């Protein structure tokens, strides 16, 4: 244990210590009584004045005491945070402390607090006050008579403070404390702010004597008088750090300040030890234990899923309302999809011809049918114009989803971004999934647990469509408050008011369905949910005749409302072209619903050829629009139609005949020979029987590996729009040109001798290879039969059959080669 008295307090050594504090610390001395000019002694007045800027005795940085002189430290004299203002602003210290010194001794004056903290009955004489702004206190040096000890003076002050607590104006919840300075305080101005933890270093009192490390019990006995201690930590026994040290953690910072200023430099002797130990105190930043962080890093299997769930919940709570707002905005923007141009001015004739179809669709939008509306027709048949410009003209709350842009996007991120743009879903962080995938992979490789940060394409598409569905429901119920049926439930109101539901138009449905079928499956399921919940009407626009398969899977128990669009009749096509050529003066007549009349006044003289040209061009809407544009620039009908046919022939030649990369972009399931076979046969017959084509050698026995499946080849050519397959009672029956102008384009290709000879040569070469394979097969079987030890009579019929087949194939090869020789001659002579 520690002895009850101070064993040793060394005197200050001159020239030792830190640099002077200059302007940051002031010593205040009491003035001595002076003599007046008349020789009479002046009445003693207790005033305090600032001394010079020297710190400590002889600028040593320490406070020296003489016999019968001691030091008290008063706490809570200055605001503790005042040092943060003054520490790096030494030029302001003079002005600030001058205010303190010049102020009256009121309760606001810190010097007045010191005076109030010392009772008048105390037998001491204050000789010097040294403020410590950084620590919020002050040293008070005093002298005392021989009849009393400093410890008795300390006890008297402690009792006085307990009986008469003095609370400064800046801290009314804590009283001023004073304690006797036992050690040798160090007046430093370093940037070391007070902390609640003190580091006590045990250094030798004399250079020759090793210090003694104090026990926790001794440290507690020594420091507890200054304030409540939360913990005492001794140095590890195996630590080789010198000097030895210990940590004392106080509950309050001001208690640590009081202990540090009173005990620093204190010399004592541990009970049972012969050597003296000096205590050197300093503030230490307490290292907080990272218990929470350690638990988090130690339990990744629990923490990572929780973080993922929190991020998901945060995303839903913050971003989903914003996304729903943008979806509603895009749905209600009736001008977003209705951007007409000059080419749409003559569609009234077409819409008059299809008025029954328009009325049928509009009637379905006014009823609770609970099924899809499907508008199917070849590309360029005007399905989009029919729906957007006539059926939905003037209707609010229409959302258009173009599947072409979605499925043609590159990568999953592009698909998500395009789908979000179609429905107005923003903000969308399509790039974040790639980053999440890398983070997920890194976590899984280190912890063995999949964090679930990344999402696949299916889940992201589902999330976008679900958010869109919620926004569409809000749109359907937006005008409910002003309706007489406002008291109905949501489901009952939606069922009772089909006219209030928004309309979803899904354009280019099943475009390139073989590439991203999952997108179409999700869109079909989403549309089915909207229809069954009476949230919206759904209209599908498609050119694919096999649309019923994915839609029946999504809505198996309903019959679709199907609208089939075909090519225009010659009369309607003629009206359409003429209406496109109308002048601006005739626009009012067209708006009033009058059917455009054909008169010599409105037609140019060369339009007499229009009937013949339209018969050659056909009734496909896009081709008629091209014809009208050419006529507007001054071309004659024959010249315009001839150019259109030539352009179509060049397109067919480039896409199907003269390259290995057809419409399938490297994944085609047909061969060039098969395409030419159809072109040549349709040019002469206009219509082919489906099964007849399947049985032809070019399709049934193709030598091209990717085109060996005849039905797949025909379906692929139909998807590429080279041909159109017509059905009868649900089965494929006939094959025709992909669009009417292709019929004329096929004939134009046959008129080209070089193209005809080159493609016929390719077909004959393939047919010769097919017959050669038949001969090889027959010869192989004859070789097996000839190797038998005896020739049984049962094999005679088989041998004769094989020989006849071999002979027939050989005759075909001879005929093919003879024809091929003529074709080669044409190729060598024609340019």
From Swiss-Prot:
Residues 323-831 are mitochondrial intermembrane. Keywords: Membrane, Mitochondrion, Mitochondrion inner membrane, mRNA processing, RNA-binding, Transit peptide, Transmembrane, Transmembrane helix. It holds the Pfam family RRM_1. Plays a role in maintaining the mitochondrial genome and in controlling the mtDNA escape. Involved in the regulation of mtDNA nucleotide structure and number. May have a dispensable role in early maturation of pre-rRNA. Residues 196-286 form the RRM domain. GO terms for biological process: mitochondrial genome maintenance; mRNA processing. Gene3D superfamilies: 3.30.70.330. It is a single-pass membrane protein. GO terms for molecular function: RNA binding. One of its GO terms (cellular component) is mitochondrial inner membrane. The chain crosses the membrane at residues 302-322. InterPro entries: Mt_escape_2_C, Nucleotide-bd_a/b_plait_sf, RBD_domain_sf, RRM_dom, Yme2_C, Yme2_RRM. This is Mitochondrial escape protein 2. Residues 1-48 form a transit peptide. It is found in: Mitochondrion inner membrane. Belongs to the YME2 family. Residues 49-301 are mitochondrial matrix.
